[in-house]
Amino acid sequence: MSWTIDIPNEALPDLPPLPDGIEEKFRDVVDRPAKQQPSWDQAQADNVRKILESVPPIVVPPEIQSLKRKLAAVATGRAFLLQGGDCAETFESNNEPHIRGNIKTLLQMAVVLTYGASTPVVKLARIAGQYAKPRSADRDGNGLLNYRGDIVNGVEPTEEARRHDPARMVRAYANSSAAMNLVRSLTSSGTADLYSLHEWNREFVSNSRAGARYEALANEIEAGLNFMSACGVNDDTLRSADIYCSHEALLKDYERGMLRLGQDDRGHTKLYDLSAHQVWVGERTRGLEDFHVNFVALIGNPVGIKLGPGITPEEAVEYAEKLDPLREPGHLTMIARMGHDKVRTVLPPVIKAVEESGHKVVWQSDPMHGNTFTASNGYKTRHFDKILDEVQGFFCLLYTSL
């Protein structure tokens, strides 16, 4: 939704200090250098950040704690994690048909995975906040500032559109809030109904050229549903689902503005990033002493970190020690994005070192970003067979390593 936002001319007052112990850690984190940040006026950005500090959160701590419990099941082999969504959301595409389509696809995939693996599937959408993009250069081939996502600037190739505008953070917040509200409505009002999802999968089998290979599986699922219906199974869990939201915690001013105090399951006061249920640190911003890694170490959310082909076992253990100091199963997700030609050689010693260190992390495959190349027309793309090869390599390694 392409809303315009009027930013108050007068700055809002600062928030009161955080409780002792948390304030010192917070100050240490925000004073650290952050890579991949916009070149906007910091005084204006500070004013916008103070607006974000006063708005209602997008998610709440009890939802975050619910996700943490489910990720603990994933880390201990009792559940499967499925994450999907847009590489980068846009304000223009943040509408009901697009969001419904993404959620419907995620739920359809979850049904097949749940049946095939006989395992609960934790559904994590890349939605309601994935508005920032890291870039390899500040400017494009035409000398314009590179597009860094709708939260920073516009994609149109003009000087004005590419200007870094901190007011866009409020637009990103408004769009994220609207998206998360719709996700909650969809998953509790029929879209997540198990019988409807199966019918949509049936339509895929009937209408897709690739559908024939899945017909036997669809028949098995249908037989299972018919059996439950005959037994009178009609629980609310068959008609609703929990979908959690996630994004890369890239933009320092935005993530800082969405921090709130809350309590965990044990009644301990913590800082939470209430822009999402889970946030992760990208491959380009994972400096151990920099802002991003130390920010996610500060918060009570479950967190992730992308590990590219340059990662070493020693580095991976350092990340585990910093981001999972209490050794909570599932608190940390390590996301392998190594490329199909590297995953089988780089990942095994990393898994071995982390497991031997006593951390029970979620191991996740991102087969998209390590297999990117630039086509002759200038567009970045991937070969599907290489994506599939990395996924297959990843799962073979997990079965032999864990």
What are these regions (language model features)?
Residues M1-R49:
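Intrinsically disordered, low-structural-confidence terminal and linker regions
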Residues V60-P62, G84-G85:
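N-terminal signal-anchor module of multipass membrane proteins
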Residues I64-G77:
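N-terminal amphipathic alpha-helix/helix-capping segment at the start of soluble metabolic enzymes
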Residues L82-C87, L124-I127, S365-M368:
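Short loop/turn segments at strand-loop or loop-helix junctions that form parts
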Residues I51-I58, A72-A73, L81, P97, ...:
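C-terminal accessory/interaction regions of large nucleic acid-associated machines
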Residues H331-I335, H340-W363, H369-L402:
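Non-transmembrane, aqueous-exposed alpha-helical and coiled segments at domain scale
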Residues A88-E89, S93-G339, Y379-R382, E390, ...:
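Active-site-facing alpha/beta catalytic cores
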Residues G77-R78, W363-S365:
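Short coil-to-beta-strand
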